[in-house]
Amino acid sequence: MHSTGEPQRGPAGPYHHPMPYHVDQIPTTSHPSWHQAPHPGLPTPPYHPQQHPNYISMQPPPSQQQQMTPQALSTQQQQQVQQQQQRQLYSSPSPSRGPAAPAQNQKFRTEQWINNQAWPYSQSPAPPVAPSVMSYHQGDDRMSMLSVNTTMTNQFPDSQRCYSSNGSTCENVNPEMMQMNITQAAEQAIRLWFNTPDPMQRLHMAKTIRTWIRQDKFAQVDQANMPNCVQQILNIIYDGLKPQPVQLPISYYAQLWYNLLDILRRFTFLPIISPYIHQVVQMFCPRENGPQDFRELICNLISLNWQKDPHMKHCANQVFQIFNCIIMGVKNEKLRTEFAQHLKFEKLVGTLSEYFNPQVHPGMINPAIFIIFRFIISKDTRLKDYFIWNNNPHDQPPPPTGLIIKLNAVMIGSYRLIAGQNPETLPQNPELAHLIQVIIRTFDLLGLLLHDSDAIDGFVRSDGVGAITTVVQYPNNDLIRAGCKLLLQVSDAKALAKTPLENILPFLLRLIEIHPDDEVIYSGTGFLSNVVAHKQHVKDIAIRSNAIFLLHTIISKYPRLDELTDAPKRNRVCEIICNCLRTLNNFLMMWIPTPNGETKTAGPNEKQQVCKFIEIDILKKLMSCLSCEGMDTPGLLELRSTILRSFILLLRTPFVPKDGVLNVIDENRKENLIGHICAAYSWVFRQPNNTRTQSTKQQLVERTISLLLVLMEQCGAEKEVAQYSYSIDCPLNLLNGNQVKPTFIHNVLVVCDKILEHCPTRADIWTIDRPMLEGLTNHRNSDIAKAANSLLSRFPENDLLAGIFSNREYF
């Protein structure tokens, strides 16, 4: 009870047991000031313990230590101080014991202090009033012996009391009791922080609060008081990060700031703090716009200069972990936007950019720096352009001060450090793991930074593709995966047409061939597909490097889609096969005759490799991709459209034999290629309509009709197509629209005409828009008008008003 009679309360509610009248005294030998020597360089007045008032003063026999010479005693004390200073500055107390040293050390140091003070415990029986433990008084580190009547102040059972050999008791030496009092010590530290100017006491308070939170005692705080308690601790952290008015050694600040920053770091991920994480974010809000601003203090802690200091380096790492925890842990979009806005100020960006200077060793770069950059530029196009161009013209190579050039240097510099190291030593080599992480984060940041065609072209012009292919030579799966992903992103750059790829492309093809990772194969085949499009010299390089054989090998090694049960795996296989076929289509276009007569001649090796794509195994696999049902795969629509395109080009290629194509029967559906094409045609109309897939669906329908027409013309399959027409709706319904392409109109009319030629009964079943069809007979395109007249003649005349609409024209 307080002197006023009111119960004392802390952030956790009422204290667990009554406090002594003098509330500023907490008897405990577990306080850090008892177990740690005063910091060198700080004044330590020679405070002396107070003797018990009933103790009769008598001079004990001189102890062995008292008989030592002053010089020998001074030497012994210096050795003790040196031993205590050798303890690690950042060692954390055991969660089960709190901030105190082990019990045997407590007992030894207590007895040592007693012997040094010539306390006559060993020569007298236990007095009726036993001396209590030591404590700091009024927030400082002065030690005193409190005379306490144990019969009046025995607040705990005997199991929580520790007895000395002569029967006296030492209240708080018991570890269980120390755990009970850590909450009181933390509450008092929070309450007295701003009234305690003494630096050492502030350090002890910071350690006490940190220990209290580390031991999950913070969860005992009353929920009603939790917001206020969190804010009090955040205010303490803010105040503690400010420099003290007196000059203190940097090692002192390193200890103080490390403990305060560790408290803040724990606030960013503790589940009990998550409802109040907005209070942590508000700390980064601009306040004073001066050196005392919290953001300015944080920038000082992560300065590149501190990375060379063995003590302050730990504080900088704590700050980076705080940033990382907030960015990765906060899910509220409004709060994330607010935090990103707080971080967009010049000093922070400049401080972080210093780590990317060429003269900085890559081992000094914390991977969290890349995460911070990604966070602040993710939705800011203007900031991305500034980092890339520094207000220079976009049609020129990026300036040396831009982030692209710096990140390329980081990439190459890190690779040079890891090139000679054995990748198998990665689990035991933290330096190697750190450098690999730096390279991967560099790839990720570049992927976000290259947000438009100008940025991508600038990256390619600065030899970014060459840098990536150099780095991915190191045999690490994560590194190769990240590098190939970035290659895929820049693969459609216009600047690649002027980039020498004679050495780059063969290396990538070998990498795709030997690497087992699906992500690497997907990114590599995607890069190949884009880079050969509309670039004839790149096609020649790829063909000379056996790219066609590689495409066949990749498709052959994957199982059928209906044999894959894992949905992500199935979707990735869809995308890989699609990339391979798209690349093949770019090659086939060179050998198909065009109206202007520009056609390249394929060599014997190319002809042999292309013909492998109509072999039985490949045909069956591609047919199953067209017709397999019962799977929700996002990439299936694009894959089926690409397969249809591949069959169209293969059948139009002069040197590809067509005779045996329709003789291949799939085991599941017992149908040849025509049946699978009709299945894909019916499937596409069952897919939901949305703006993202609308164009792909229309493309699939157009390619279905085109392929059926090619089969009729190239393979003589008119009768077979007519027989399979029972499974599809009337294609004439596809012509109801104003945006239909003339080529598609002609193909639909011809296919329907051939179907009715071999199956006239279909005319009685199909429901058509006769006025629309009659209007097409007057189309300005003579081929369309001719096909419409031929088709119209196959339908019975059953509309007396048909002639009224016969003069309509479609353009």
Curated annotation (Swiss-Prot):
Residues 64-103 have a biased composition (Low complexity). Its main location: nucleus. InterPro entries: ARM-like, ARM-type_fold. Residues 1-105 are annotated as: Disordered. GO terms for molecular function: RNA polymerase II-specific DNA-binding transcription factor binding; scaffold protein binding; transcription coactivator activity. Disruption phenotype: RNAi-mediated knockdown reduces the difference in the relative level of expression of helix-loop-helix protein hlh-2 in the SMDD/AIY neuroblast by comparison with the SIAD/SIBV neuroblast. Low level of ectopic expression of tbx-35 in the E lineage. Ectopic expression of irx-1 in several posterior sublineages of ABp. Loss of ref-2 repression in several posterior sisters of the normally expressing embryonic sublineages. Guts are missing in about 3-10% of embryos, but this increases to 100% in transcription factor skn-1 or Nemo-like kinase lit-1 mutant backgrounds. GO terms for cellular component: cell cortex; centrosome; cytoplasm; kinetochore; nucleus. It is found in: Nucleus; Cytoplasm; Cytoplasmic granule; Cytoplasm, Cytoskeleton, Microtubule organizing center, Centrosome. Keywords: Centromere, Chromosome, Cytoplasm, Cytoskeleton, Kinetochore, Nucleus, Transcription, Transcription regulation, Wnt signaling pathway. GO terms for biological process: embryo development ending in birth or egg hatching; embryonic digestive tract development; endodermal cell fate commitment; female gonad development; gonad development; gonad morphogenesis; male gonad development; mesodermal cell fate specification. The keyword Nucleus applies. Exhibits low sequence similarity to canonical beta-catenins but displays functional and structural similarities so that it appears to be a highly divergent beta-catenin. Interacts with TCF transcription factor pop-1 (via N-terminal region); interaction is direct. Transcription coregulator. Part of the Wnt signaling asymmetry pathway, probably acting downstream of putative frizzled ligand mom-2, Wnt/frizzled receptors lin-17 and mom-5, and dishevelled homolog dsh-2. Activates or represses target gene expression, depending on upstream Wnt signals and interactions with transcription factors, such as pop-1. Required for the activation of Wnt-responsive genes in the E blastomere; thereby leading to a role in endoderm specification and gut development. This is Beta-catenin homolog sys-1. The lineage of its organism: Eukaryota, Metazoa, Ecdysozoa, Nematoda, Chromadorea. The gene is sys-1.
